[in-house]
């Protein structure tokens, strides 16, 4: 007899999809027994239950809505019936990704939350009606797309959290000296230098960040979930606030301790740069500590951090840099103080990560 074996990649892809909280439903024109046999081979859940195309024609939409909550196999189904299945899933609040390749699949592909057409054997009509076209017609590619999408979402969220956090101390140190009637800490060229660190950090460092180990073990987000939630905004704000408190303390202790204006400014600004770099390292992951995050390679991170430290050295120790930024050179002890203060400003969030992970597990 003839045999059309399942692709080797499909069972593992189905398992990974289940781990990511994605339900997999098989809609086929095959006979029920054939469909159930394939379902068992690929590891589909609940292969005992099925609905045939004839049954689908006989049951009402309300009954279909109830039965589709547990049935994952639809056999002897014609393309026109896919639209009913999509509508039943969507009426239950599901986000539906539908695959198809034929002309008659177009209505279901268009109605689904995400239409996925086959690029190899799919028709032009199916491709036009879809949101995504699979070049290799492989189910594994769909799971890989989910992984990439979650990584991009994570990295956007991290970049936005970092942007909010880093601008809190910048805004604070621009305003507070005016209120206290002390010399200005941040002059225009200081803010420009900070932005030269912030922009590549957001556009390059977080973009190049690898996905976290548990990215395909998380439940899917709902369509109502915000990219930048209140919880994320609150944590980011407190990251920035803690940096502001520490940097302001360094400035006030230095200035009222009798240091010159240029020395106080250099000390405060260097602390802010170290804290800024700390925020970049810290926001690479909200579940792994800084030291564990270093296990994940990101060459761009080291270019940005190295460049920032190099140019910080230039403006601290070369005469033209000192004149331009109104700095005086710092001693080795001063640098250690700035480094310690910068690390102290982000320490609480590292502790939060540890306790948060313990709570989750």
List each language-model region with its residue ranges.
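Cytosolic catalytic headpiece
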Residues: 1-104, 110-114, 156, 178, ...
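Membrane-embedded transport module
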Residues: 46-98, 112, 117-287
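Hydrophobic alpha-helical transmembrane segments in multi-pass integral membrane proteins
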Residues: 173, 246-248, 307-323
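Residue-level signature of transmembrane alpha-helical entry/exit and packing/kink sites
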Residues: 187, 235-236, 301, 334-338
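Alpha-helical transmembrane segments of multi-pass membrane proteins
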Residues: 194-198, 271-279, 308-315, 341-349
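Short, Lys/Arg-enriched, Gly/Pro-containing loop segments at transmembrane-helix junctions
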Residues: 212-219, 290-292, 356-361
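Cytoplasmic-side transmembrane-helix entry/capping segments in multi-pass membrane proteins
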Residues: 292-301
């Amino acid at each position: 007899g003839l045999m059309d074996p399942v692709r080797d990649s499909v069972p593992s892809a189905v398992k990974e999809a289940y781990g990511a909280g994605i339900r997999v439903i098989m809609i086929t024109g095959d006979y029920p027994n054939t469909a159930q046999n394939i379902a068992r081979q690929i590891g589909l859940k609940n292969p005992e239950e099925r609905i045939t195309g004839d049954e689908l024609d006989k049951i009402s939409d309300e009954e279909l809505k109830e039965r589709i909550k547990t049935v994952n196999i639809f056999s002897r189904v014609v393309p026109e019936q896919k639209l009913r299945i999509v509508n039943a899933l969507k009426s239950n609040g599901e986000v539906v990704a539908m695959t198809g390749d034929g002309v008659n699949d177009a209505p279901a592909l268009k109605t689904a939350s995400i239409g996925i057409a086959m690029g190899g054997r799919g028709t032009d009509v199916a491709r036009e009606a879809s949101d995504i076209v699979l070049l290799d017609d492989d189910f594994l590619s769909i799971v890989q797309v989910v992984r990439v999408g979650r990584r991009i979402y994570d990295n956007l969220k991290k970049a936005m959290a970092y942007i909010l956090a880093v601008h809190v101390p910048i805004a604070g140190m621009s305003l507070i000296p005016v209120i206290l009637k002390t010399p200005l800490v941040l002059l225009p060229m200081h803010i420009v230098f900070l932005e030269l660190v912030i922009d590549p950090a957001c556009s390059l460092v977080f973009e190049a960040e690898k996905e976290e180990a548990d990215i395909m073990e998380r439940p899917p987000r709902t369509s109502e979930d915000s990219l930048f939630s209140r919880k994320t905004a609150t944590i980011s704000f407190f990251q920035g606030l803690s940096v502001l408190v520490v940097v302001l303390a360094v400035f006030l202790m230095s200035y009222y301790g009798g240091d010159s204006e240029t020395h106080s400014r250099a000390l405060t600004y260097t602390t802010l740069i170290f804290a800024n770099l700390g925020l970049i390292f810290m926001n690479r992951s909200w579940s792994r500590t800084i030291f564990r995050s270093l296990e994940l390679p990101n060459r761009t991170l080291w270019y940005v951090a190295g460049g920032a430290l190099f140019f910080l050295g230039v403006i601290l120790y070369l005469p033209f840099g000192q004149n331009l930024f109104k700095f005086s050179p710092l001693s080795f002890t001063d640098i250690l103080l700035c480094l310690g203060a910068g690390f102290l400003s982000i320490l609480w969030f590292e502790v939060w990560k540890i306790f948060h992970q313990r709570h989750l597990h």
